[in-house]
Amino acid sequence: MGQIVTLIQSIPEVLQEVFNVALIIVSVLCIVKGFVNLMRCGLFQLVTFLILSGRSCDSMMIDRRHNLTHVEFNLTRMFDNLPQSCSKNNTHHYYKGPSNTTWGIELTLTNTSIANETSGNFSNIGSLGYGNISNCDRTREAGHTLKWLLNELHFNVLHVTRHIGARCKTVEGAGVLIQYNLTVGDRGGEVGRHLIASLAQIIGDPKIAWVGKCFNNCSGDTCRLTNCEGGTHYNFLIIQNTTWENHCTYTPMATIRMALQRTAYSSVSRKLLGFFTWDLSDSSGQHVPGGYCLEQWAIIWAGIKCFDNTVMAKCNKDHNEEFCDTMRLFDFNQNAIKTLQLNVENSLNLFKKTINGLISDSLVIRNSLKQLAKIPYCNYTKFWYINDTITGRHSLPQCWLVHNGSYLNETHFKNDWLWESQNLYNEMLMKEYEERQGKTPLALTDICFWSLVFYTITVFLHIVGIPTHRHIIGDGCPKPHRITRNSLCSCGYYKYQRNLTNG
C-alpha cells in the first residue's frame, strides 16, 4: 500500500520532467525552423548581394561542385614580331609594326582626294613595274615587315594588280602615301566596292560601314549609287604612315586573317599539323610533364593558368575548336619564333608557311563573316570552361562570343555551359567506371551480378508460393508427391475424389 502511495506522490514530479523535455523539444524545433525560414526569406541573400554588388566575379557556380569560369589571352605578346592592328572608328584603321620597330600604317576612308591629278609627285601604281607596291614605300627605315604588309594589302587582300585608281607618292623621303579611287570601274565602281568588301572581311566589325549596301541607278553610261544602307559609300581609301601609340587596342587577328586570305580563295586541300608538344611549367618556369600551363604574359590576369592532359587530348582529337587553334599559336610561338627573334624576315616567312597548318582557316573566315553579318563571333581572346572544384578537371574551353563590341552575358549561352557541365559529369563517371573495372576482376563482377539476379528470382518465387497438391479439409497434409490428372495425391493416400471445399 505504501508503494502505491509513493507512486501516486511521484506522478507530479514525473509530469514536470515530461513537460521540461517537451519544452526543450519544442524550443529546439522552433529555433531550427526559425533558422530555416530565415535562410529561405532572402535576407542573407540580399545582404550578400549588397556586399558583392559592383564587384567582378571570375566564376559563377553552376551546382555544388561545378562553376563557370574563363581565361583571357593577351594576344599582343604572342606575336610581337608581326604587325598588330585595331579599329578606332568606321573610317580609321591602324597597323603598327613589330615590337622592335616604330612605324605605323593608317587606313582611312574619306571623300576627299589628297592626290592632285596634275601633281608630279603621284604615280599610277599600275605603271610601277607591273604594279609593284613596294616602290611606294619611301619611309627610309624600310623593313621587310612593312613591305610585306603593303604587298599583302594590295595583292592578296584587295585583290588588285593593275587597279587604275591606285596612285602613290614616289618621292624619296615622302613616307607611305597610297590612294585608291573607289569610284573608278565599270557599273558605278564595283571594283571599289569589291576592294572595300575584301578589306572589311579582314578587319571585321565595326567595319560594316566600310562595305555600304547601295543600289545602282544607271541611266545610259552614267551610274549613281542611291539608297545606301548600313553606312556611307566613300570615294577614296588612303594608306599612309603614322605613329601608332595610343590609337586603340591592338590585336594580331587581322594579320592572321590576312595570312589565311590566300588559302580561303584556294582550292588546294590541306591537313592540319598533328599533335601538341605540351608540358607543364612550375612557378619557377621549369618544365615538368603532365599538362600545359599558360605563362603569365599570355593571360590578362596575373598568375599561371594550367590545363590538364585531358583537355589537350581533346584538342589533339578534334581540331574544330577556336581554343585549340589559340593553343597551337602559343605552342608555335614558344617553340619556333623564339629561335628567330633576331631575324624578322625569317620569322615572318616561317609564320606564313606554317600558319595554314596551325589553325583552321574555316574557323577564322567563318568568324570574320559572322562579324560582318552582326552575328556573335569569336575574337580568340576570351574563353569559358567548366571547372570541377573537387577534382580540378576542366572541360574543353569554348570561345566567349562577342556581339556589338561586347561579350555576351552568361544567360545568352546558358544551354551551352549546362551541356558542358553534364558532359563533364559523364566523363568523370565513365573514368571512374573504367578505373573500377580495371581494379575488380571481371569474373568476380559477373558472379556478383548473377547471384543477385538469382536471389531476386528466388524471393519472387517464395512470395508467390506455387501450390504442389490439394489439402482436403479434415485430413493431414500429405508428404511431397506428384499430382494426378484428377488433382489427387499420387501416393494413394486419397483414393476417391470428394466434393469438399478445397483449401
UniProtKB/Swiss-Prot annotation:
| N-myristoyl glycine: lipidated positions | 2
Q: Which residues are glycosylated?
A: 89, 111, 181, 241, 379, 387, 404, 409
Q: Where does Zn(2+) 1 bind?
A: 57, 481, 489, 491
A Pfam family hit: Arena_glycoprot
Give the InterPro entries listed for this entry. Answer: Arena_glycoprot, Arena_glycoprot_zinc-bd
Task: From the record, give the cysteines joined by S-S bonds.
Answer: 86-248, 293-306, 315-324, 378-399
Molecular function (GO) terms for this protein are: metal ion binding
Q: Does the keyword Membrane apply?
A: yes
Q: Which residues lie on this side of the membrane: Extracellular?
A: 2-17, 59-446
Q: Where are the transmembrane segments?
A: 18-33, 447-467
Task: Please list the residue ranges that the record places on the Cytoplasmic side of the membrane.
Answer: 34-58, 468-503
GO BP annotation list: fusion of virus membrane with host endosome membrane; receptor-mediated endocytosis of virus by host cell; virion attachment to host cell
User: Highest taxon of the source?
Assistant: Viruses
Indicate the family of this protein: Belongs to the arenaviridae GPC protein family.
HAMAP family documented for this protein: ARENA_GPC
Protein name as it appears in the record: Pre-glycoprotein polyprotein GP complex
Q: Which organism is it from?
A: Pichinde mammarenavirus
> What does the record give as the organism's lineage?
Viruses, Riboviria, Orthornavirae, Negarnaviricota, Polyploviricotina
